[in-house]
Amino acid sequence: MSLLPYNATLCRVLRHNVKFIRSVQTSAARVSAEKTPIQVWGWDYLMRQRALKRPIAPHLTIYKPQMTWMVSGLHRVTGCAMAGTLLIGGVGFSVLPLDFTTFVEFIRGLGIPWVILDTFKFIIAFPIAFHTLNGIRFIGFDMAKGTDIPSIYRGAYLVLGLAALISLAVVVYPRWERHKKATLPTNH
């Protein structure tokens, strides 16, 4: 078996790649060590600001917290947290040799006090409820509904309150149902 045809093809492909790379290198703009006037002005401006002990960019701590940007930021954070949790959880449960039910039973078997478990349930339920309700609120914004400042604040407080109530219901209802079943009289 001869490798000559294969070698000839490989050399031809490499020769074309070298030609392409050389053409890109010669046609690309050269990087100059010399700065343009606007770059020089910008650098000098930043150095003057640094000498005056000023921050390069304003920090959030200099602004009065407002409900509008706090709720918007929380919406983004909850969305990213849920996406990350879904990604890590999905990959984790597909790779690991256990399923979600086994994981839940393992957590129950640890004997963690109910206060801690319910706190974690609330921490899990709140972002889901908040992100869902605030997403509905944002759909209203897309339809130009409730975009005046009083309505925005009312809607933000409503979303936060409802999300807290729904999360609390998600945590309390199963415990209430178990308590109700345990206290029902048995008919013998």
From Swiss-Prot:
Coarse class of the protein's main subcellular location: mitochondrion
Gene Ontology CC annotations of this record: mitochondrial inner membrane; mitochondrial membrane; respiratory chain complex II (succinate dehydrogenase)
Binding-site positions, a rhodoquinol: S72, R76
Molecular function terms from GO: electron transfer activity; heme binding; metal ion binding
Superkingdom of source: Eukaryota
Tissue: Expressed in adult muscles (at protein level).
Positions of a ubiquinone binding: S72, R76
Cofactor (UniProt): heme b
SUPFAM superfamilies, sorted: Fumarate reductase respiratory complex transmembrane subunits (SSF81343)
Membrane spanning stretches: 70-95, 114-140, 154-176
Pathway assigned to this chain's UniProt record: Carbohydrate metabolism; tricarboxylic acid cycle; fumarate from succinate (eukaryal route): step 1/1
One record GO biological process: mitochondrial electron transport, succinate to ubiquinone
Subcellular location: Mitochondrion inner membrane
Function: Membrane-bound large subunit (CybL) of the mitochondrial electron transport chain complex II, which together with the membrane-bound small subunit (CybS), anchor the catalytic subunits to the inner mitochondria membrane. During the free-living egg-larvae stages, which occur in an aerobic environment, complex II acts as a succinate dehydrogenase by transferring electrons from succinate to ubiquinone. During the parasitic larvae and adult stages, which occur in an anaerobic environment, complex II acts as a fumarate reductase by transferring electrons from rhodoquinol to fumarate.
UniProt similarity note: Belongs to the cytochrome b558 family.
Subunit-structure text: Component of the mitochondrial electron transport chain complex II composed of four subunits: a flavoprotein (Fp), an iron-sulfur protein (Ip), and a large cytochrome b (CybL) subunit and a small cytochrome b (CybS) subunit. There are 2 developmental stage-specific forms of complex II which have the Ip and CybL subunits in common. Complex II from the free-living larvae (aerobic environment) acts as a succinate dehydrogenase and is composed of the common subunit Ip and CybL and the stage specific subunits FpL and CybSL.
Protein name per its UniProtKB record: Succinate dehydrogenase [ubiquinone] cytochrome b large subunit, mitochondrial
